[in-house]
Amino acid sequence: MNLGIVSLFREHVDSIPNILPHQLATLDFLLRSILDENNSVLLFHIMGSGKTIIALLFALIVSKFKKVYILVPNINILKIFTYNMGIAVNLINSDYVLENIHIYSTTSFYSLNYNDNVINYNGLAKYNNAIFIIDEAHNIFGNNTGELMTVIKNKNKVPFLLLSGSPITNTPITLSNIISIMSDEGINFSDIIIQGKKVFQILLNENGVSVLKRILRDKISYYELQDTELPSIVFHGRRFLDTRIVYCHMSKLQERDYINVRKLCNNEMFEKNMNNVSLAVLGPLNLINNLDILFQDQDKELYPNLKISNGVLYGDELVSLNISSKFKYFIARIQSLTGKHFIYFSNSTYGGLIIKYIMLSNGYSEHNGSQGTNPKTIGGRLKTFAIVTSKMKSSLEELLAVYNSPANNDGSRIMFLFSSNIMSESYTLKEVMHIWFMTIPDTFSQYNQILGRSIRKFSYTNIAEPVNVYLLAAIYADFDDDITSLDNYSIDEINVLPFDIKKLLYLKFKTKETKRIYSILKDISVNYTLPPHPQIVDVVLGELTRQFFYHHSRVRADDPELFAAIDRVLCSPDSTRRYLDEITRGHFFVCNRVFEKALLYRHGEDIIVVPFKLSHDQFLWAINFRKEYNVGAPL
């Protein structure tokens, strides 16, 4: 990034609509690398730092010269990008051609370019002289869309902007797709990878390090938020390597079923049944692979105090919780906690079902659903929960609007948000004070993505208050090991540890290698100091103007401080005077700390901010019958 741009801003005010200094500095780098040099770039910015806005601002700027195709993982994220495009348009102080920007979900882009599962090569010519922006780039490969991107790259010779907060999803092998899309050089990955027997033993060798540095040098933009921009994190439980976890000792009932299921698992690291029984046991249903089975039984006894009928669980066991050591801890702990909770779990088969009836049985009511037994309240309102799974994508936006609303900062509208992997990327959660892992994530990337939904810039009004994180592990009743080093156990010894402990150790092994590679990417990230790129000058000047008039309501037209701020970029007194004249004649939009939304006006020898308020005729509906006419019905 261009550190020269960052140096233009002192004590940048982030609380108003603005473009952050690091975003402007990154835009400068993208323009030089992609627009000028036709090189691909990996935008490796840690979650919550504003990659989406950077990508959209870049798309707007280059839309004057090229067509831009933006690919996102799914329709919900497409809606997020479309919404943020409106924000980017309002922020950018530059010309653009919106018709040249096309945003697709990967599935819709696939359907546009395939006929009967075969790439339509004749139709690829339309992508000549284009730029592709790939959101969550680490997840797009290994399928037909990834294959299509490789074909377009080789056939059309177009540059790619790859967005990722975690470019290694599992092992270093997953980085190979990103390298291949960013380079014309063929790579034999067996030459750069050390392949062990276990997945966490896949390492990048010394030759691989050299290849990585050579191919990706000058093609990486790395950024992570400063500690001062985020709340601190407090991990709860006992020490486990470099973090803490909560040991949840299983009851005899849970441990018996847990051991029986484990004996039947050939490769338990990939067995969803182990995720099931680590969360909770359901007797005869522990090994089911089809949720429909849960809705077929009539009054089936699972345990003496737990039955299921038509998909409804009932019985005292939902309160005594011998079926789940994790929920026994969770239910007991939350009674003394205040604020909102975000709870990650794997919905392997029956996760969502067991959560629903445990919460209802313990007095917590379902958002827009059933009321809990002896319902608990906060400020006269029911304490409620919501469960997000892949089956509720269509209503997720409405749910998050309630959860993130200022009225819900205390959790009085929705206190507990349970979510499976659907919430692991691109979504933002606000004012979450407690983050729970009911299931141990499979990868370091997934773990970071889940934390990154909540712990991100602008998600907290008070960053002085810490965020609490609970990693829950279901363990045997007699397990009490202190794990302080990855060298504590041999591979054979790891295999007989409780499933969650084994999974955590695997995660930490993979994390160690991932962090090593991330350090390499950080080291080859590009930083420089230059005047702003010509295509970004107006955007930089616009942000300098916004920052200045946040603090000032009225200044002389030749105010030395204002003049100096603008002239540092233009380096021409005449050009600076013309710019100041243009923004007053054009009534540039600013946010002032006194008057809030305002426009700039010239008043005699002064420049003043004039607050405004939009008003409009009230209509119940309007129909655009023709482009020239609108017909409306007044209220």
UniProtKB/Swiss-Prot annotation:
InterPro entries attached to this UniProt entry: DNA/RNA_helicase_DEAH_CS (IPR002464), Helicase/UvrB_N (IPR006935), Helicase_ATP-bd (IPR014001), Helicase_C-like (IPR001650), P-loop_NTPase (IPR027417)
One Gene Ontology MF term: helicase activity
Entry-linked Pfam families: Helicase_C, ResIII
EC number, as in UniProt: 3.6.4.-
Binding site for ATP: H45, I46, M47, G48, S49, G50, K51, T52
Transmembrane intervals: none
Enzyme class: hydrolase
UniProt short sequence motif DEXH box, positions renumbered to this chain: 135-138
Residues in coiled coil: none
Subcellular location field: Virion
Entry keyword set: Activator, ATP-binding, DNA-binding, Helicase, Hydrolase, Nucleotide-binding, Transcription, Transcription regulation, Virion
Principal cellular location given in the protein's record: virion
Domain of life of the native organism: Viruses
GO cellular component, one term: virion component
Domain (Helicase ATP-binding) ranges: 32-185
Function of the molecule: Acts with RNA polymerase to initiate transcription from early gene promoters. Is recruited by the RPO-associated protein of 94 kDa (RAP94) to form the early transcription complex, which also contains the core RNA polymerase. ETF heterodimer binds to early gene promoters.
Subunit structure: Heterodimer of a 70 kDa and a 82 kDa subunit. Part of the early transcription complex composed of ETF, RAP94, and the DNA-directed RNA polymerase.
Family: Belongs to the helicase family. VETF subfamily.
Protein name: Early transcription factor 70 kDa subunit
Source species taxonomy: Viruses, Varidnaviria, Bamfordvirae, Nucleocytoviricota, Pokkesviricetes
